[in-house]
């Protein structure tokens, strides 16, 4: 017994010693760097080797320096082991989903691998059966648990199928787009009862109900007009001018108004107009409303180009407003039709109202256009053969135009967009030969460019304005990312969309100018966040200063383009982009003018006022915005100008420079260079401006030796006598024989009392001295 205890003690002692020996060894032999660094000669001599080729010792002895080859069994890195661990966990998780109750031990995995290697053609669905055969205990437990829950064979089979890993397809409902005989559409979402009934019909293999009987009234509702409605329609129809005038106004609309946004195809519109004019008994309220709005736009654009436009009653009495009022009166009848004409009418009315005093109502009509587009299913792609390829393309162009208006109105008003991008499944507009007008340039590439800019604008508003990051560094990262995407958009721009200032006669000159203005507006919207940071913190990085420079350059480019359009009579307040983008660039240029005041900025601001004055003379909204900008400009001017009405405050801001200036004058005896008026005058009281006046021009101060010019350069207004208000109370005289006064601190100058009391006391004393001397 004692021998066994002694053996155990010796063994425990040896184990403890071995453990201590392992702890003392700090670096394992296989990880020591010296193992492969020393050459064979240094190893044999047991001397230090520097690992060179050759080493210093071998080079000195002039012998061959040979190193032992490294072992190919490299030690696995820690990162690789961690990656293997993650891979193992992922594979175990995947296998557990396929075979939930399989025991993932090494011996079981080896067994199932051998079993699967015997039958390479075994399908995947049979793997679960093989695993159950290998693990009998698990299979028995599953059988007992299933019998405990339910003893029926069907439930046992369903449960075994679930355990086998067969994925059951989910139950889904699809949205539908019903098409009528006249290509009228009706959108039914996946939550509607019709979608549920259709799913039941498919599952029960029932015959589908005829859509002609089910949706005929909902697709093409028959509208019956009352006597009052018919009178409204007849009155609106009577306002249509002669055919020659109609053609002129229609061409003016499609050339000048419908540029980057699509409302109606010109060829189809003229064909529909001929049919409408030929049928006097039947009046289509939808097309009549669109026709009146097109004529109103054409008339207003023609009237805008006249130079003798009255600012007061431009929108009060003209033919365009009468046409617009007639279209607005029959618009409720258009809503009852619930077809594409409701979308087009709402869009045109909203565009027209933005240049009037009812600018806020225009956003409501834009919202109606969006809601009607969704109700008609314009945002969903349809495979129905009833819709021709041309009809699908026209619907796609109209929806994308509504989408762009929604995004840009969202940016202008600050509200969130109404159509989520995820809900739109239609493709981009494409060029179809049947829809192209011979001799005219296609606007499809312009539309695609504007659509991409609308998406980027929404991303800008979402990341920088609606959901801003609390950290400025994160905001700079967002600016960097968005700016990179804008540059990518610019590099991918089609050559026909690139704006050329010299190509004034190009058919898409105005459209390309608007695309460039939208791009510059996106740059301003992205980078003006950093411009606000500059007002708070002037120590910015070079990258942030570059972004501020880009902001100013974009605003400058917008005004130059707008002024170019104004010069060639292409600028219009009826254009959404031509109206809002110049006003968006105005605050940036005014801020740059008052902080930099360079000649280039002054020239651009001069063009800015010309553009805004033109828009304000033709638009009520622009007139109010211009007055607001003028007030902002006055505030900036008052902030940067010296406060001449408060000499104490002005003296506080420049007291230190003034002290150094007086000190330089006292040391250099500069008092003799000034003309002193007092005794040499007629003995009348003199103001400080008269008593202390330079004998020559103000520039002579710069030539005086020893004068501190920092004060002169920083405060140029102090050298101009006209900038100071004369004070009849403070009458001071300076004697030539007096020496310069010693410096006084600011507290000694003002004294412990109030500044106003001290100034009044000083004024009283000086007035008494003056009276005594004159008396």
Curated annotation (Swiss-Prot):
Main location: nucleus
SMART domains registered for this protein in UniProt: Fungal_trans (SM00906), GAL4 (SM00066)
CDD domains, alphabetized: fungal_TF_MHR (cd12148), GAL4 (cd00067)
Source domain of life: Eukaryota
Bilayer-spanning residue ranges: none
Modified residues (Phosphoserine): 208
Keyword Zinc: yes
One annotated GO molecular function: RNA polymerase II cis-regulatory region sequence-specific DNA binding
Region (Disordered): 676-695, 754-775
Biological process terms in GO annotation: DNA-templated transcription; positive regulation of DNA-templated transcription; positive regulation of thiamine biosynthetic process; positive regulation of transcription by RNA polymerase II; regulation of transcription by RNA polymerase II; regulatory ncRNA-mediated gene silencing
Keywords attached to this entry: Activator, DNA-binding, Metal-binding, Nucleus, Phosphoprotein, Transcription, Transcription regulation, Zinc
Cellular component terms (Gene Ontology): nucleus
Ranges annotated as DNA-binding: 39-65
Compartments in which it is found: Nucleus
Function of the protein: Transcription factor that activates the nmt1 promoter. Regulation of thiamine repressible genes. Positively regulates conjugation during meiosis.
Protein name from the UniProt record: Thiamine repressible genes regulatory protein thi1
Species this chain originates from: Schizosaccharomyces pombe (strain 972 / ATCC 24843)
Gene: thi1
């Amino acid at each position: 017994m004692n021998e066994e205890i002694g053996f155990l003690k010796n063994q425990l002692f040896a184990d403890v010693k071995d453990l201590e020996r392992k702890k003392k060894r700090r670096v394992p032999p296989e990880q020591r760097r010296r193992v492969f660094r020393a050459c064979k000669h240094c190893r044999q001599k047991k001397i230090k080797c520097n690992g060179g080729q050759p080493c210093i010792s071998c080079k000195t002895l002039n012998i061959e320096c040979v190193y032992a080859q490294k072992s190919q069994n490299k030690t696995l890195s820690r990162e690789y082991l961690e990656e293997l661990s993650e891979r193992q966990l992922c594979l175990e998780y995947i296998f557990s989903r396929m075979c939930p109750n399989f025991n993932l031990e090494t011996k079981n995995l080896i067994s199932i691998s051998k079993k699967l290697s015997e039958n390479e053609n075994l399908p995947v669905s049979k793997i679960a059966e093989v695993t159950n055969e290998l693990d009998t205990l698990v299979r028995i437990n599953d059988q007992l648990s299933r019998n405990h829950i339910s003893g029926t064979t069907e439930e046992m089979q369903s449960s075994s199928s679930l355990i086998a890993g067969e994925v059951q397809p989910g139950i889904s409902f699809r949205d539908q787009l019903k098409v009528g005989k006249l290509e009228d559409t009706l959108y039914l979402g996946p939550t509607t009862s019709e979608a549920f009934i259709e799913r039941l019909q498919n599952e029960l293999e029932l015959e589908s109900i005829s859509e002609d009987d089910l949706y005929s009234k909902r697709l093409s509702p028959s509208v019956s007009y009352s006597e009052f409605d018919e009178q409204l329609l007849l009155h609106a129809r009577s306002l249509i001018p002669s055919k020659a005038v109609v053609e002129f106004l229609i061409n003016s609309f499609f050339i000048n108004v419908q540029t980057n946004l699509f409302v109606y195809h010109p060829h189809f519109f003229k064909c529909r107009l001929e049919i409408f004019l030929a049928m006097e008994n039947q009046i289509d309220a939808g097309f009549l409303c669109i026709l009146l709005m097109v004529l109103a736009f054409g008339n207003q654009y023609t009237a805008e180009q006249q130079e003798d436009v009255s600012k007061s009653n431009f929108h009060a009495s003209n033919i365009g407003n009468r046409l617009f009022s007639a279209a607005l009166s029959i618009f409720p009848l258009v809503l009852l039709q619930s077809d594409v004409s409701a979308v087009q009418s709402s869009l045109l009315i909203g565009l027209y109202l933005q240049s009037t005093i009812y600018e806020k109502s225009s956003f409501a009509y834009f919202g109606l256009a969006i809601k009607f587009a969704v109700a008609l299913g314009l945002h969903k792609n349809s495979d129905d053969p009833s819709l021709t390829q041309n009809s699908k393309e026209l619907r796609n162009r109209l929806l994308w135009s509504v989408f762009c208006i929604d995004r840009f109105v969202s940016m202008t008003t600050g509200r969130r967009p109404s159509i989520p991008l995820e809900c739109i499944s239609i493709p981009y507009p494409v060029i179809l030969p049947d829809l192209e007008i011979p001799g005219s340039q296609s606007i499809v590439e312009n539309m695609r460019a504007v659509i991409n800019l609308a998406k980027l604008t929404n991303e800008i508003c979402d990341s920088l304005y609606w959901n801003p990051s609390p950290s400025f560094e994160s905001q700079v990262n967002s600016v960097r990312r968005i700016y990179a995407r804008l540059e990518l958009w610019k590099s991918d721009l089609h050559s026909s969309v690139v704006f050329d200032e010299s190509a004034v006669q190009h058919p898409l000159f105005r459209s390309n100018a608007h695309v460039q203005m939208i791009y510059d507006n996106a740059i301003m919207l992205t980078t003006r966040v950093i411009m606000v940071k500059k007002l708070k913190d002037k120590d910015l990085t070079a990258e942030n200063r570059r972004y501020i420079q880009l902001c100013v350059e974009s605003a400058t480019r917008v005004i130059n383009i707008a002024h170019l359009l104004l010069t060639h009579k292409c600028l219009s307040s009826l254009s959404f982009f031509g109206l809002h983008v110049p006003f968006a660039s105005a605050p940036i240029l005014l801020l740059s003018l008052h902080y930099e005041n360079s000649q280039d900025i002054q020239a651009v601001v001069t063009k800015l006022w010309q553009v805004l004055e033109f828009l304000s003379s033709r638009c009520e909204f622009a007139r109010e915005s211009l007055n607001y900008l003028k007030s902002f400009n006055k505030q900036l001017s008052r902030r940067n100008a010296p406060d001449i009405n408060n000499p104490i405050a002005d003296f506080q801001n420049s007291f230190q420079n003034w002290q150094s200036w007086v000190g330089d004058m006292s040391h250099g005896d500069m008092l003799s260079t000034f003309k002193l008026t007092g005794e040499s005058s007629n003995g009348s009281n003199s103001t400080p401006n008269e008593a202390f006046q330079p004998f020559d021009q103000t520039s002579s101060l710069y030539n005086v030796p020893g004068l501190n010019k920092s004060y002169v350069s920083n405060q140029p207004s102090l050298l101009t006598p006209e900038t100071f208000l004369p004070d009849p109370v403070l009458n001071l005289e300076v004697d030539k024989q007096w020496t310069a006064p010693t410096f006084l601190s600011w507290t000694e100058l003002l004294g412990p009392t109030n500044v106003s009391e001290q100034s009044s006391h000083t004024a009283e004393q000086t007035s008494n001295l003056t009276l005594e001397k004159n008396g």
